[in-house]
Each structure stands twice: as structure tokens, then as C-alpha cells.
Amino acid sequence: KATGREILFSACNWGMEEPGEWMRAIGAHMYRSTGDIMDNFVSFTDIVKSQLNKLCMSGNHCFNDMDMLTVGMEGKGNVGLGKVCSYEEYRLQFVLWCLCGVPLMMGADLRTLAPEYRALMLNPALLRINQDAECRPPYVVRRDSVCIPNPDDAQAPWAHPADTAFVLLRHLTDNEFALFYANLSDADAEVHCEMADMGLPVTGGVALDMTDVFSGEHLGPQKDSFNPHIKAHDCRLFLCHLVKDNA
């Protein structure tokens, strides 16, 4: 403070002793909530899953820092451990960091970053969600298991791998919502969500008017349930508004 310059107080104890409960009180502007990230799918999804019940411990002036982005690192550097992520896996990571309001710090070398990852991290819709003025964290609408074929077991032809799907909803400025679906399983699958899980019963007289962030497709009003088919290790993201249900 004596310098007259603004200071960013970034605190780190690698998630020990529940930092989200007291970091704001000591003046931290952002705090590391987990161990160090590695450049692979298991590492970043384990980090996210460890924070799903702590999303409320992040907000204006004190943000949950789930570590740097490994998007586009492609196994380079000292965090390059394990199988290199696919584009869809890196996109999943970036969308989650944006949706959860995580401070966005690149680990990749900007000079050699592949064009598709540069475009991903400059996506204006995703950055707008991350930088939303109200800084509200998302909340978990549903945390579930996907249902995938299990052809090797005649007695149990369908498998339900644990903790492989979740749905998040974030309330944005101007009564807009970001609705996110993740499929963390190793197979393509539907991820299920009832609108009632978001507090929108089918008899409530309202629906969600949805637009796909990745494709730009306007899906129109959706009510009752919306269960997108999602590739393995991938996600879907929609921007939504509440509209009257005229049906």
C-alpha cells in the first residue's frame, strides 16, 4: 500500500484447512483451493470435482483459483504428465474455468500456441461468462452417473460409472443464465436434467429459451427436461433466458 499501487494478493496453501472459509477474511483476492494441476484429463477433472460442493466460496474480491489453465500445453513443461488432452478435453477445462469464475492464467506458451486453442481462449461468449459483472458462482443442479452400454456383461448390459456427469447453472447479469452439461465418462452418453431440478416445474408457466454457445444454434424454449447427447470427455454449454410457456 505504501507504494500507492494496486496489489493483487494471491494466496496459496494448496487447499489445506478449508481456505474458502477464511481467505476473504485475511484480505486475499484469490486463493488456491487444490493441489497443483497436471496437464491431463484426470487431473483437471479431479480438481473440479473436489470443488463442486465449494462453489459458493468464490465471488467478487475473493476468487477460488483452481490453478492455471493447461489448455494448449500438449504435454510440454513440468506439468506434462500422462496422456495429452484432446481438443474437447481442453475445451471442457476452459469452459469450466470460465463458468466457475476462476482467474484465467495461461500455462501454454503464447508464441507457439496452436490456432484452435488461441481461438478457444479468445471466445467472447466464454470470456463474458467468466467476467460477468455480478460474479455469481454457478451451482450444481445435478450430479449423477451416465448410462453406457456394457456389452461384455450379459447380466448387466448397462454400466453406470460413478460421478461421470454433472449439470451446472450460473445466473448472469440481465437475467441471463449459463447452463452447462458435462460427460466425464469414456463413452458418448446422454446427460439428463429435469427443468424442475432448476426450480422450473412443468406447470410453472415458464420455459428456458436456449442457444448453444459452441454452434450458435438457437434451440428455442425448452421445458420439462433437456437431455443432450454428449461425446466422451466433452461438454455442452447454453445461454438461456426465461420466457413464458404458451403451450
Feature-to-residue mapping (PLM):
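Catalytic cores of secreted or luminal carbohydrate-active enzymes
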Residues: 95-158
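Alpha-helix-loop-beta-strand connector modules within alpha/beta enzyme cores
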Residues: 2-4
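Flexible loop/turn segments at secondary-structure boundaries
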Residues: 16-19, 78, 106-107, 113-117, ...
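Glycan-recognition surfaces
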Residues: 6-109
